[in-house]
Amino acid sequence: MQKVLVTDERRMLPTYASMPAEELPMFAENRVHQRSSGNPYPCKIVAQVDRQHREERPFRVITLENEYLRLELMPELGGRIYAALDKRTGYDFFYRQHVVKPALIGLLGNWISGGVEFNWPCHHRPSTFMPVDVSIEEELSGAVTVWMSENEPLDRMKGMVGIRLAPGEARFDTRMKVYNGTPARHSFLWWENAAVPVNPQYRLVFPPDVHYVQFHYRKNVTTYPVASGVYNGIRMGDGVDISYHKNTHQPTSYFCATSKYDFFGGYD
């Protein structure tokens, strides 16, 4: 294959209805959300979910494909990677969500699981369930970058994520551009939230100099890979190897401590 193939199509997906946003403003100056104030004003909040009404709905899907990978992007759902297929093995190496089912995790309410969610200026970003702008760049080398961008609705800062796939490579790159077009100073976070399929053998891989992990806001700390004591209300006992996903029986988070290395991963 001499160049990356790009397709732009509409695809039907089972979709649960999104509830109407609250009409009254939420003044939540003390609402904590991923180390930001979490104050949604003047944006409206979706505060309920609908689990009764589901229908087939069309969504725009942009596909990038070379000899090894097929990436599916969904600009109408926050500008996310919906799925990524290893063509050699037929394996979806990100979790492919087969239904659009909003949950109340986003800063403004709606959020969906699966694929890769891109977040700015905080996590999970205000517009994670909103459409974004799209532009496609084709290089002379045959590589293609799909840029998905927006002016986020709270601070009006611009964030752009570019998904680049080149011919002959069994990998893709994400690129980012950020702009503050306002006269004010704003804090900024960039977070790429990937969902992966797991099994009893799935193992978290942190760099070799990481010996402890932290919970959100550094509220709790425990040793890694073998944890003990109490962490986020979970009794670890005399020692649990938390590098294996099967040993975590309750919802929680393990954030990698400071490291001189620039990688992490998972292996199944």
Describe every region a protein language model picked out:
Residues 4-5, 9-29, 62-64, 69-72, ...:
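A contiguous, surface-exposed recognition patch within enzymatic or periplasmic domains that forms
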Residues 27-56, 61-65, 113-171:
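Extended, loop-rich substrate-binding clefts of extracytoplasmic carbohydrate-active enzymes
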Residues 74-76, 86, 119, 152, ...:
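Acidic/polar residues at beta-strand termini and the immediately following turn/coil
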Residues 88-108:
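Active-site-surrounding "flap" and adjacent substrate/cofactor-binding loops of secreted or lumenal enzymes
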Residues 107-125, 213-230:
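Core domains of carbohydrate- and sulfate-ester-processing enzymes
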Residues 158-162, 174-175, 187-190:
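A short secondary-structure junction signal
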